[in-house]
Structures are given as C-alpha cells and as structure tokens.
Amino acid sequence: MTTSHENHNTAPAPSPQNIYDDPRFFEGYRTLREQDTGLNGALEIPAMRGLLPDLRGRAVLDLGCGFGDFARHARAQGADRVTALDVSANMIEAARALTHDPAITYLHASIEDCVTAQAAFDLVVSSLALHYIADYPAVVRRVFDSLKPGGTFIFSVEHPLQTAHPVGWVRDAEGNKLHWPPDH
C-alpha cells in the first residue's frame, strides 16, 4: 500500500485491471466523467446515494475511489472520516488535487490488497470497481471483517451488457451479414 507521502513518478505499465494509468485512456476517461452525461450520473450515482444510511459521524471506506467524488460527498453528508483507495496512481493524484479535506485519506492500493483494522468502518462503498477484481469472495470477506457490527456494504458493478465482448454479425467470406450468433 502506498501512502500520500511516497513518490509515484515511476509507475509500472498498467495491468488490465489498471488501465486508468495508461495516459491516453485516463485522459479520455477524465473527459467523459467531466461531461457527466453518461449512465453514471443519470442512474448509478443517484441509485447508490439512495441506498446510503445517515453518514453523520460515520467512518467510511471507498474501494476504487476514482476521482474521489464519493469521498467528498460522504464528508459533505457528515461522515467523520473517509478512507478512499484506488489501484490507479493517476486517479489518486487527481482525487488529491480535487480534495482539500484532511478528514479524507487517499491510498494508492488495489482492492485485493487492502487490509484494514477489524471493525473499523460503518460503511464500505464500491462504485463500479468490483468487476475488476479476480477474487470476489476474498474481497467480500475482507469487507465484512472491516465493518463495525451493523455496518453496511453498498456496491455497484457494470451491467454485463457493458462488460461482455461484442460478437457482432456472423459474416460470409465477402463480409455480407449472415446472422446474429444465437449464443451471444
């Protein structure tokens, strides 16, 4: 786990999980999120916020925090402290630049490697990040261990229509459309 005091100038090549450290992908993603005209703003964010408990005085963990939007929202809703982590050095750097709140701690770490104190958080949130992890059961066990008794875990993942590989039409040798694959 990397803290805010360490140097991130020599980042390794991004893994498939960490495409956000590819400079071209990151800038395209940043532009997309700045427009906020996609499904995140229209559906996912309001749905997630609608599930939240009262955050006043709560300790919150944000897994896959991206630009830190939820961390800042949690503090605006009265959370006592927020720990937010992301595997992407670019995301953590951007989140820190956008945040001026000492009660929010950003960590450069993968969700799989995140180790927290037992029963440290009232709420754990993960917005559109768990579909990147390989060992979902292990992460859920860690989340459960990190929650205080009566704590809440709220998460979203991308819909399979977004993550499925598009197959497209089956075509003949000349490129003419023959049919759509029956088991897409």
Task: Please describe what each predicted stretch is.
Residues 115-124:
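A short acidic, Gly/Pro-enriched loop at the edge of an enzyme's catalytic core
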Residues 123-137:
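A short SAM/SAH-binding and catalytic strip from SAM-dependent methyltransferases
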Residues 52-55, 118, 140:
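A short, aliphatic-rich alpha-helical micro-motif
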Residues 61-63, 67-114:
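Class I SAM-dependent methyltransferase SAM/SAH-binding core
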